[in-house]
Regions:
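Bacterial N-terminal signal peptides that target proteins for export
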Residues: 2-14
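Bacterial N-terminal signal peptides
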Residues: 13-23
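Bacterial Sec-dependent signal peptides at the C-terminal "C-region" and cleavage site
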Residues: 24-33
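STAS-typified acidic loop motif
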Residues: 38, 47-77
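Extracytoplasmic/secreted envelope proteins and their assembly/folding machinery
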Residues: 75-79, 103-107, 130-131, 135, ...
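Glycine-rich beta-to-alpha active-site loop
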Residues: 115-157, 161
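Charged, glycine-interspersed solvent-exposed loop segments at helix/strand-loop junctions
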Residues: 160-242
Length: 242
C-alpha cells in the first residue's frame, strides 16, 4: 500500500511524458505488414539481445525502461532493478519476446510491487512473452500507437530440432511430438492461471492467441495479431481510463 500511495501523485506527470512521446512517434506514416495486416512491417520491439533495464526520469517521475529480448535471467535482474529503484512508478516495455516462462515470472514480480504501472508507449511493441510482463502491471496502459502483439506459443518453430528428429527416424519424431504436446499443454495451463491471477479475460487466449497459426503456410502467412485499443480494453489487457 505504501508504494501505491507514494506513486499516485506521479501518474499524471508520467502520462504527460508518454503523451509527448506519442505525439513525436505517431507523426510518421506506418507501413503495414502484408503477411500480418493488423501489424506494422517493422515493429519497434528493440534489437537488444537481452532485455536492458534502464531507470530514467520522464515528466518529473522515475520510470524503468525495459527493452529487448527476454531471457532466463530477466526475473532476477528485474527484481534487483526494482529493489534498487523503489521510487520507480512505471515500467515501459518494448520487446520481441523470448523465454515464455521468464516472461511469466517477470510479470509476477511486477505484480508483487503493488501499484506499479506497466505501459507500452506509442510506437513501441510488446510481443509474445512480453505480453505477460505487461499483464503484471496494475494498472496497465497501452498508449494510442502502442502495440500489444500476440501469437500462438509453440515449439514447432525450432526447425533444426524437427529436421534432426525426422532424420533419426519415426520413433525419434514420435518422441519429439510427445514432448511438444506435453510442453504446450503445460504452458497453456500456466498461461491460463496467469491471466486469472492478473485479472485479464481468459478469452484473450481462446479468442485471440489460440486462433493464430503457429506456422505460416503457402495460403496464409499470418502468424501474429496486433490488438486494437478496443480489444485491449474489452479483454482487460489495458485497464486504465486514460
Amino acid at each position: 500500500m505504501h508504494r501505491a500511495m507514494y506513486l499516485r501523485p506521479k501518474v499524471v506527470r508520467i502520462a504527460l511524458a508518454a503523451g509527448l512521446l506519442s505525439s513525436l512517434t505517431g507523426a510518421a506514416k506506418v507501413k503495414m505488414d502484408p503477411a500480418n495486416p493488423t501489424c506494422p512491417l517493422t515493429p519497434d520491439w528493440s534489437a537488444n539481445t537481452t532485455m536492458q533495464l534502464t531507470p530514467v526520469v520522464k515528466g518529473g517521475a522515475k520510470v524503468l525502461l525495459a527493452e529487448g529480448r527476454i531471457d532466463a535471467g530477466l526475473p532476477d535482474r528485474l527484481k534487483a532493478a526494482l529493489a534498487a529503484n523503489p521510487d520507480v512508478g512505471e515500467v515501459w516495455l518494448r520487446s520481441p519476446g523470448g523465454d515464455a516462462r521468464a516472461g511469466n515470472a517477470a510479470g509476477r514480480i511486477i505484480r508483487s510491487n503493488f501499484g506499479l504501472t506497466t505501459r507500452i508507449p506509442a510506437g513501441w511493441a510488446c510481443f509474445s512473452a512480453c505480453n505477460f510482463i505487461f499483464m503484471g502491471g496494475q494498472p496497465r496502459v497501452i498508449d494510442p500507437g502502442g502495440l500489444f502483439i500476440v501469437h500462438m506459443f509453440t515449439r514447432t518453430g525450432d526447425r533444426s530440432t524437427i529436421d534432426m528428429s525426422v532424420a533419426m527416424g519415426t520413433e525419434a519424431t514420435r518422441e519429439l511430438i510427445g514432448d511438444i504436446e506435453q510442453d504446450a499443454a503445460l504452458l497453456a495451463s500456466e498461461d491460463n492461471d496467469f491471466l486469472i491471477r492478473m485479472g485479464v479475460s481468459r478469452k484473450l487466449l481462446t479468442e485471440v492467441m489460440y486462433q493464430q497459426k503457429a506456422l505460416e503456410n503457402a495460403d496464409d502467412k499470418s502468424t501474429r495479431r496486433c490488438l486494437t485499443q478496443t480489444e485491449v480494453k474489452s479483454y482487460n489487457v489495458a485497464n486504465n481510463n486514460e
